[in-house]
UniProtKB/Swiss-Prot annotation:
Example of a GO cellular component annotation carried by this entry: cytoskeleton
InterPro entries reported for this sequence: CALM/Myosin/TropC-like, EF-hand-dom_pair, EF_Hand_1_Ca_BS, EF_hand_dom
Family stated for the protein in its record: Belongs to the centrin family.
Family annotation (Gene3D superfamilies): EF-hand
Pfam families (UniProt xref): EF-hand_7
Organism (species): Paramecium tetraurelia
Region entry Disordered, spans: 1-29
Residues reported to bind Ca(2+) 1: D50, D52, T54, S56, E61
Name this protein carries in UniProt: Caltractin ICL1d
Gene: Icl1d
UniProt-annotated location(s): Cytoplasm, Cytoskeleton
Binding residues annotated for Ca(2+) 2, in chain numbering: D86, D88, S90, Q92, E97
Functional description taken from the UniProt entry: Plays a fundamental role in microtubule organizing center structure and function. Component of the infraciliary lattice (ICL) and the ciliary basal bodies.
Amino acid sequence: MARRGQQPPPQQAPPAQKNQTGKFNPAEFVKPGLTEEEVLEIKEAFDLFDTDGTQSIDPKELKAAMTSLGFEAKNQTIYQMISDLDTDGSGQIDFAEFLKLMTARISERDSKADIQKVFNLFDSERAGVITLKDLRKVAKELGETMDDSELQEMIDRADSDGDAQVTFEDFYNIMTKKTFA
């Protein structure tokens, strides 16, 4: 309670990321050209890059996220992105701000060559496929601890022929939303 003559601190509205039951509600973020499934995918990426679990991404986390998605991420660019998107002045990006950034970036990078570059980041052995081992390596490089079942689920969602590997065609189809399991 505020003392007499003092104003109580301003109350910030909680992020619209969770509904009354405390669960993330992708429907709150759906807009023309963006499906619930796409919102969920971006939320998964957000959670992956929010390595400290604060429900916001700081400059270090944003740089790792952009680099892993195949974008050049110079410090000046990162700070400019945060400045451009940080509507609440926190110096960090919350999910709504991240969603705005990623939907803009995704529309810019749909060319096959750009998608190939991203695929190559994951295909560390240049075998032409992304395996569980490849995903494990990427997660480790990002400082993310994910168990094999979570990583395998990612592979299973993209793998069209059930061989436990993601080909470039599988990856391209997921990235361009031609298929989504």
